[in-house]
Amino acid sequence: RKPLNYLTKLVSDLAMERFRAGSAMVRYSDEEVGSTDRALGTYLAGAAAREFGPDAGQRAVIRLASSVPGNGLFAFGSRVLDLVVDGGAQDGTAKGASGGALAVLKGVNLDGLRVDGSTGKSFAYGAIGGRFLVQNCADSRACIRMSGADAVFGGRITGPVRDEEGNLASRAHLKGFAFEYMTGGRVVVLGDPGPWICAGMTGGVVYQCLYPEHGFTAESVRRRLARFAAVELLPLSGPGRADLDELLGAYVATLRASNQPAEAAAVQALLDQAPERFLMLVPRGLPPHQE
């Protein structure tokens, strides 16, 4: 059996060979990457930083089709990485990342339907930079200790949330404890953020989409706050609208590039209604856009 670090080392070796030869950009495509291929992108981020420094301009564009890579995808990723997965991801994705771009999108199954597009536990744990897009769901503790990165969770609410049934996490897009101890960064949540959110959050901003037509209102968001979470819900501000234009604009462009025009149009429609649809979760007493 191949070692668990085989593919990440292979990608790193191939890219570094091209970088040393003078190429500023390399492209790598693969398919059916599975759970035994761990920490994909991590080796390359480290090798590039050691040899060219953290501010080097090299870029590796990695595209993985029909894939669900193993734990630690993009972990400690840097600005050298631009990675898109059609399929899904597992635990520890984008953990400790300092830059770069990652998109986890739905893949096409044997019936031609788009499925999955989700990621595992502790997504973007402690990330200080980078832009991360997830089309569907994330397991528990998404964006905890995040301190400067940007994230978009694109799963949308399309039916009644049924809070009266309890067990909120089972139907939520984020499965609990999201944004715990978050100190900076920007997050957009198009779906249900799940229970026990924002515990110990002291910085950054979360933009939450509302769906009053499905019973998901500001009160629904308050119901999901962790006990003693010191955050407040504010109307969307001017700078907040600019953030949404930037982050959701990038997400819409990524959906269109992956041949998902219908989903891109649905997200664009939410963005067009941003003042009515979105509110901001910010630490109590702190400006939402502090430097």
Residue ranges of predicted features:
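Long, distal/terminal scaffolding or interaction modules
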Residues: 1-291
